[in-house]
Curated annotation (Swiss-Prot):
Physiological role: Essential cell division protein. May link together the upstream cell division proteins, which are predominantly cytoplasmic, with the downstream cell division proteins, which are predominantly periplasmic.
Organism of origin: Yersinia pestis
GO biological process: FtsZ-dependent cytokinesis
Periplasmic topological intervals: 22-106
Entry protein name: Cell division protein FtsB
Family indicated by similarity: Belongs to the FtsB family.
Length: 106
C-alpha cells in the first residue's frame, strides 16, 4: 500500500505541475484570455468605424443632398449664382482675449 500511495502522490504532483506551469496551463490561459479581451475591444472599435462608413456610403448613394453638403463643407464650393459671405469677428473682440503689449514710458 505504501507504493500505491507514493505512486498516487507522484501522479498528483505531476498533474499539478502540468496544470500550473506546463504548456497550456493556467498562465497560458490567463495570457490568452487577456489577448482575447484586447482583440474584442479592437474589433468593437473597428466595427463601429465600419458601421459609420457604411452609413456614410448609404447617405452618399441616397441622394444629392449629402454630396452637396460635402462639397460645400470640405471643398468650399458654392452653386452658380450664389454669393459666399464669411463673417469675421471684430478686431477688438479678437484681441480682447490676448494680453496687451503696451509700453508704459515713465
Amino acid at each position: 500500500m505504501g507504493k500505491l500511495t507514493l505512486l498516487l502522490l507522484v501522479l498528483l504532483g505531476w498533474l499539478q505541475y502540468s496544470l500550473w506551469l506546463g504548456k497550456n496551463g493556467i498562465h497560458d490561459f490567463v495570457r490568452v484570455k487577456e489577448d482575447v479581451a484586447a482583440q474584442e475591444a479592437n474589433n468593437s472599435t473597428l466595427k463601429a468605424r465600419n458601421d459609420q462608413l457604411f452609413a456614410e456610403i448609404d447617405d452618399l448613394n441616397g441622394g444629392q443632398e449629402a454630396i452637396e453638403e460635402r462639397a460645400r463643407n470640405e471643398l468650399g464650393m458654392i452653386k452658380p449664382g450664389e454669393s459666399f459671405y464669411r463673417l469675421v469677428p471684430d478686431q477688438s473682440r479678437r484681441n480682447a482675449g490676448t494680453p496687451s503689449t503696451q509700453n508704459n514710458a515713465q
